[in-house]
């Protein structure tokens, strides 16, 4: 089938329409059910990680290998010309784009991925995270997991917990879910880490219901998805961190009264905001969520690198 994502840069979740999202998710489901080990044979993909990554880098590179793409790149910019000799990002991308069919890039600077698109020519750039700005492929695997467990992406009740101010995953996921109808959001965070006003304004503009809460217990019985994030110690005064840390920890006993099919998600890594006794409950789904990153990223790579795709 012809697809609108061929050679498209994927920098922000807002680069994808609702139809685009549905296309990626449908493709991911097909690849999970029916692997296509030679789909990207003869393609060369650059995996350019200018900062450390575990799940995202390994997930992307596994996705590439399982589709038979050749992978080049680096996991740390310290030993590159950019890191050792002061080469500009623009020159680095200009050169790399002459070698490869696509560039997957993580960078600590917000806006770096968008900047890279100005120097990559016809080679698509896929953002694997740029600072605290965007992480669109995390959102795709989140959506895939929600759809897989709940059977839909509309008319859901979603709670987001923890660092909602600086956490790029919750911003992107809220923006993506707002493209679907009837979703209702519960935001649970300390005042210092509340969801940014621009996200709340966006929900108001779309007529989406949302509310603010001080504890997980307030909403446990009402939600389909509980999306946990880490409260970042470095963002808070030490005394304030000590106060809020215990308030936003999920324990197995907190799941009493939860809906039978409610799933707990987390972008990982977790520190201590989900106790290990939760892992043994049927609600825990964060490791399966991480595994779905393979299929979401395979789908995106396949669509970006094939003008027509028949699965």
Swiss-Prot record:
Annotated EC: 2.1.3.2
Lineage: superkingdom: Bacteria
The reaction(s) this protein catalyses: carbamoyl phosphate + L-aspartate = N-carbamoyl-L-aspartate + phosphate + H(+)
Residues noted as binding L-aspartate in the record, renumbered to the chain: 85, 168, 230
Recorded metabolic or biological pathway in which this protein acts: Pyrimidine metabolism; UMP biosynthesis via de novo pathway; (S)-dihydroorotate from bicarbonate: step 2/3
Gene Ontology cellular component list: cytosol
One matching Pfam family: OTCace_N
Residues bound to carbamoyl phosphate: 55-56, 106, 135, 138, 268-269
InterPro entries per UniProt: Asp/Orn_carbamoyltranf_P-bd (IPR006132), Asp/Orn_carbamoylTrfase (IPR006130), Asp/Orn_carbamoylTrfase_sf (IPR036901), Asp_carbamoyltransf (IPR002082), Asp_carbamoyltransf_Asp/Orn-bd (IPR006131)
Molecular function GO labels: amino acid binding; aspartate carbamoyltransferase activity
UniProtKB keywords: Pyrimidine biosynthesis, Transferase
GO terms classed as biological process: 'de novo' pyrimidine nucleobase biosynthetic process; 'de novo' UMP biosynthetic process; amino acid metabolic process
Transferase among keywords: yes
Record text on subunit structure and interactions: Heterododecamer (2C3:3R2) of six catalytic PyrB chains organized as two trimers (C3), and six regulatory PyrI chains organized as three dimers (R2).
HAMAP family hit by this protein: Asp_carb_tr
Described function: Catalyzes the condensation of carbamoyl phosphate and aspartate to form carbamoyl aspartate and inorganic phosphate, the committed step in the de novo pyrimidine nucleotide biosynthesis pathway.
Family membership noted in the UniProt record: Belongs to the aspartate/ornithine carbamoyltransferase superfamily. ATCase family.
NCBIfam families associated with the record: asp_carb_tr, PRK00856.1
PANTHER family in the record: ASPARTATE CARBAMOYLTRANSFERASE (PTHR45753:SF6), ORNITHINE CARBAMOYLTRANSFERASE, MITOCHONDRIAL (PTHR45753)
Protein name as it appears in the record: Aspartate carbamoyltransferase catalytic subunit
Gene name, Swiss-Prot/TrEMBL: pyrB
């Amino acid at each position: 089938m012809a697809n609108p994502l061929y050679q498209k840069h994927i920098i922000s979740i807002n680069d994808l329409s609702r139809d685009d999202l549905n296309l990626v998710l449908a493709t991911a489901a097909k690849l999970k059910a029916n692997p296509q080990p030679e789909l990207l044979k003869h393609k060369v993909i650059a995996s350019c990680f200018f900062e450390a990554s575990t799940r995202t880098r390994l997930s992307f590179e596994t996705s590439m290998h399982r589709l038979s793409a050749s992978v080049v790149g680096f996991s740390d910019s310290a030993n590159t010309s950019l890191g050792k000799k002061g080469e500009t990002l623009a020159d680095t991308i200009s050169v790399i784009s002459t070698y490869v069919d696509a560039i997957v890039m993580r960078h600590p600077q917000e806006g770096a991925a968008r900047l890279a698109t100005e120097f990559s020519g016809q080679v698509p750039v896929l953002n694997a995270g740029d600072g605290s700005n965007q992480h669109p492929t995390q959102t795709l695997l989140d959506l895939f997991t929600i759809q897989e467990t709940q059977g839909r992406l509309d008319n859901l009740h979603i709670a987001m917990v923890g660092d909602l101010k600086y956490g790029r995953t919750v911003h992107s996921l809220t923006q993506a879910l707002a493209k679907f109808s009837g979703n209702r959001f519960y935001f649970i965070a300390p005042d210092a880490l509340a969801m940014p006003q621009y996200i709340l304004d966006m929900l108001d503009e779309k007529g989406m219901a949302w509310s603010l809460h001080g504890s997980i217990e307030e909403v446990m019985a009402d939600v389909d998805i509980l999306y946990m994030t880490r409260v970042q110690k470095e963002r808070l005064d030490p005394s304030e961190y000590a106060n809020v840390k215990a308030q936003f920890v999920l324990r197995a006993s907190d799941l009493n009264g939860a809906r039978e099919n409610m799933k707990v998600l987390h972008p990982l890594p977790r520190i201590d905001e989900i106790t290990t006794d939760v892992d043994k409950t049927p609600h825990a789904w964060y490791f399966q969520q991480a595994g779905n990153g393979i299929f979401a990223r395979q789908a995106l790579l396949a669509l970006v690198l094939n003008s027509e795709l028949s699965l």
